Swiss-Prot record:
It is an enzyme of class 3 (hydrolase). Na(+) binds at residues 161, 164, 167. The active site is at 6. This is ATP-dependent protease subunit HslV. It comes from Aquifex aeolicus (strain VF5). It catalyses: ATP-dependent cleavage of peptide bonds with broad specificity. PANTHER family: ATP-DEPENDENT PROTEASE SUBUNIT HSLV, METALLOPROTEASE TLDD. One of its GO terms (biological process) is proteolysis involved in protein catabolic process. Allosterically activated by HslU binding.
Length: 176
C-alpha cells in the first residue's frame, strides 16, 4: 500500500528561517493521522530538518544526519555531503525512501538518496506531496510582499492544504 504524506516548506527572510510541515499521514485512500510531526530541531537547535516520505525512513535519516552534524561540529554542508554519500553507497541506506530538507543560518538544502544536495537559487525550498503548491505560493509571497519568513510559511502551507489532498492545515513551524 502506498503511503502519501507531507508538505515541508522552508523560507528565509531578514536573517530568519522558518520551516513548517503539515500533520497529515495518508494510507491508501484514508487519512490515518492528522498531527504527525515531520520537522525537528537538531544539533543544539541550530539546524531544522523536515522529511517527506516514509516516516521510519525519514526518522532514520534524521538520526544519521544528527550523527554527522555531531561529527562535523554542526557544519550542515559537510554533514549533508557525507550523509548523501553514505545514503547512495550503503546497501541498507539505499533502500530508504524519503527526502530531507535541512536548514541552518547559512544553508538551505534538499538531500536525496540519489546523492543530490540541492541549494535553491532563492531562499524558498519545499518537498513532499504538496511541496510544489507550497513553493509556488511562497515564491509569490516572497517576491511580492514584506511578510516575515514565518508568515510566508503559514500562508503558503495553508494554500497547499487547500489544493493537495495529502496536506492538511495542522502545521508545525520552527524558526532559527
Amino acid at each position: 500500500m502506498e503511503v502519501k504524506a507531507t508538505t515541508i516548506l522552508a523560507v528565509r527572510r531578514d536573517g530568519k528561517t522558518a520551516v513548517g510541515g503539515d500533520g497529515q499521514v495518508t494510507l491508501g485512500s484514508s487519512v490515518i493521522k492528522h498531527t504527525a510531526r515531520k520537522i525537528r530541531k537538531l544539533y543544539k537547535g541550530q539546524v531544522i530538518v523536515g522529511f517527506a516520505g516514509s516516516a521510519a525512513d525519514g526518522l532514520a535519516l534524521m538520526e544519521r544526519l544528527e550523527a554527522k552534524l555531531e561529527e562535523y561540529r554542526g557544519n550542515l554542508l559537510k554533514a549533508s555531503v557525507q550523509l548523501a554519500k553514505d545514503w547512495r553507497m550503503d546497501k541498507y541506506l539505499r533502500r530508504l525512501e524519503a527526502l530531507l530538507l535541512a536548514v541552518d543560518r547559512e544553508h538551505m538544502l534538499l538531500i536525496s538518496g540519489n546523492g543530490d544536495i540541492i541549494e535553491p537559487d532563492e531562499p524558498v525550498l519545499a518537498i513532499g506531496s504538496g511541496g510544489d503548491y507550497a513553493r509556488a505560493a511562497a515564491l509569490a509571497l516572497y517576491r511580492n510582499t514584506d511578510l516575515s519568513a514565518r508568515e510566508i510559511v503559514e500562508k503558503s502551507l495553508k494554500i497547499a492544504s487547500e489544493i493537495c489532498i495529502y496536506t492538511n492545515d495542522k502545521f508545525v513551524i520552527e524558526e532559527i
